[in-house]
Every structure is written in C-alpha cells, then in structure tokens.
Amino acid sequence: MANNIYRVPTIYSDIKKTTEPLSVRVPGSKSITNRSLLLAMLAEGKSTLRGVLFSDDSRHFLKCVQDLGFETTVDEESCIVTVEGLGGKLPCEETTLNVGSAGTAARFLTATLGVSEGVFHMDSSEQMKRRPMDPLLSSLAELGCEVRCEGEDGHFPFTLTAHGSGQDHISIDIGHSSQFLSALLIASTLSSEDFTIQVEGTHGMAYIEMTQKMMEQFGVCVERPTPDQFRIPAGQHYKALDYQIEPDVSAACYFYAMVPLLGIPVCVEHVHFESLQGDVEFLRILEKMGCTAQDTEKGVLLLPPSALSDAGTQTPAFHGITVDMSSCSDQAITLAAIAPFADSPTCITGIGHIRFQESDRIHAICTELTRMGIRCEETQDSITIYPGTPKPCTVATYDDHRMAMGFALTGLRTEGIVIDDPGCCRKTFENYFEVLDQVIAEISEV
C-alpha cells in the first residue's frame, strides 16, 4: 500500500498448479466479540474472553466498558480480555462514552444504559452520526428514559437520563437494523418483570439468533411465543464464563469467494457450518453457484466448480444466481465483487437495510461497478449484476470496510483495480491487506 491506496495484483493467470488447498486463519468474530463484552459486563463475576478481535470497532466497545468503570485486563498478543462483571450494576452513574463507528457499541450500550440508572453522554464518529438510532431511542423513551439529542433528532450525539425500566413490554421496528432488537434482548434482564418485545420487520434474524444463543450460553433463556415476539422471564442473570470466540466468518468469506473466482480450493481454519454466525450461509450460496463444501475437522473446505466454461480451460465456470441475502447481507458486496465473472446474471435481493449501514451499500456497489463498465441495476432492496470484464478503476470505498475488502477480490482477476483508502478496513480486520498479500504470495507464481 502506498499513498493510502492499494493496487490489487492481478494473479489470475499466474495461479500455481497444485491440489493443496489454501489454508487461511482469520481473526475473531466482531459480532461475537462485542456481544461477549457486553454479556461479560452484565454477568456476575470475572469472565475470560478468548479469541477476541482487536479492531477499531471492538477497541471502541472495550474502551466504553472501561470508561463505565469496569475492571478489565487486556492481552492483545494472546487475544484475551477479562471483564469483572457486577451482575447488572454499573460502577458509575454518570460518564461520557464515544462509540466511534461501531454500530454494535452504539446500539447495545445505548439500550443497556437506557434501562439502567444514571446520566450518560453518548458521542460517536461522524459516520455513526449519519446512521439511524431513532427506533431504539423511541423505545427507550417509552421505557422511561429521558433522551436529549444534541444534534439531529434520532442520531448521535445524545444524553440518556435513565431511571430503570418503567414497563414490562416494548415494540421495536428493525427495518433499518436488527441490532435494535439484539440490544433490547440483552438489556432485558435488567427488568424486574417478565419482559416482552414485539418486533416489526423480519430482516437480520440470523443475528438475532446469534444474540439469543449467546444469551443462553451466558445463562439467560429467551422464549419466542410467536415469530414476531420475544419473552424474557424475570429473575434470570448472566453468569461469568471462560468463553471462546469463533473466527470471523464475515472475514472468512472474502477468502472463500476466491474459490469460484480463481478456481482454487480454500479452507479457513476453525470455520464450521454449526457456527453462530449467519454469514456461514454465504458458503451455501457459493455451493449453488457451482462450488462444493466439505466440513472437515480443520474447517470448511470449499472446492471450485469442476466444469470449465467455453471461455477456455483457465476459467472456472460458476453460475449467476438469484438469492435473498437478508440472512447474510454483509456479504452482498462480496458477491457483487465476483458476480461480473459468473456465466449469467446475479440478482441479490432482501438487502434494502444495507442502504443505512457504513454507506448506502446498494448505491455504492452499483456506482463502482458502473465505473468499471459493468452493467448493473438497483431497486430499493436489490441489485442485479450482469457478466462482463471490469475495466481499470480506482474503487471509492466510502469509508466502508466491506467495500475495500470486497472489491479487492475483483482486481485479483482483472487488471487495473486500485482500492482507495484501504485503511478503512481497520474497523473489523486491521491487517486484511497484509493477509491478502500473504495469500497472493502463496498461491501465485508472480
């Protein structure tokens, strides 16, 4: 990387001829790391978290836990953090927190503090100030929390004056983010009554299931009387754990996407289909496009399509697909980045909510593909991408880590792709481009 750009090496014609799969190790899951930090904070006693991801998002979350007064120890080299929980109590009743650009910190901590007791001044990065908070803040106001927004209503920064939970039920619209529901679920144990959450919207349920399973691992049972209702019986408390965090499947997917793109087998260590993470569904999508998956002791091994296209023996034939990616929407960019090389159009649906993430991802994808000369079409909640050969292009990343990491894949197969501001990947995968360079050196003869 130089001058804050990354020139992607085009290695497609230089792939080593080998039957040995590429073996990759990725850092811990951001989603699980940040959930486990909050659950450990709310538990009674000392939790030891292993395999912790250290990135911009998780560091902001950890700093917030520390700024609230919780005792922690941090060993970045060993990826271990300990948190001394106080059984739902907070060490301080007034403080200022900055969540950075971390959506999980923004939503999860806001919900927990909003049903606690105290005065909490909440700030964020400029990027996070553009992302919606209103559904969660409105729900907290219904529960008795005083919310004072200091800028645009429903956005950071704001001050919470919390008096505990004033009622035993709430409704939440998750049309913009499933994190609103996850946040309220985790915080619900602070209520002295049975707590019921009525949900409007259906997207992101894979993340909700992750939250529910992790709550159960930490000792709290969540009931689901109907598909759109959650009930948390009173009297439950989180227990401190020695907890192993899974590798980040979202990060693993960039390397699995190389399988159809470059025609190489890939195994990401310790990634298995029984993962808590919804992005494991992306591997099933790649199977439908022609790949074959084997869940081995080491991790899922993904094999490239065996058939070859009419374009020549170099090109693995993988198929376009129409797919609802609402359960693994973080991989919409990944699929879009390799879709031009498929043998038929790809239509990604169920992703309207990604317009409200680090960037308007639907618009960003279509803008950058169009600049590469690739035909694509967008609706409010879908993208259709047609086969073609991408032209040289400097890809704008919109301060969005997934745009940077995803579109680097495109350049592995076509000349002239440059990633602008690759450092934005520090949000979730600080050394992504270093790992990518190592992979390139291993699989190519350049």
Q: What is the predicted function of each stretch?
A:
Residues M1-V446:
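Short, structured segments at the rim of ligand-binding sites
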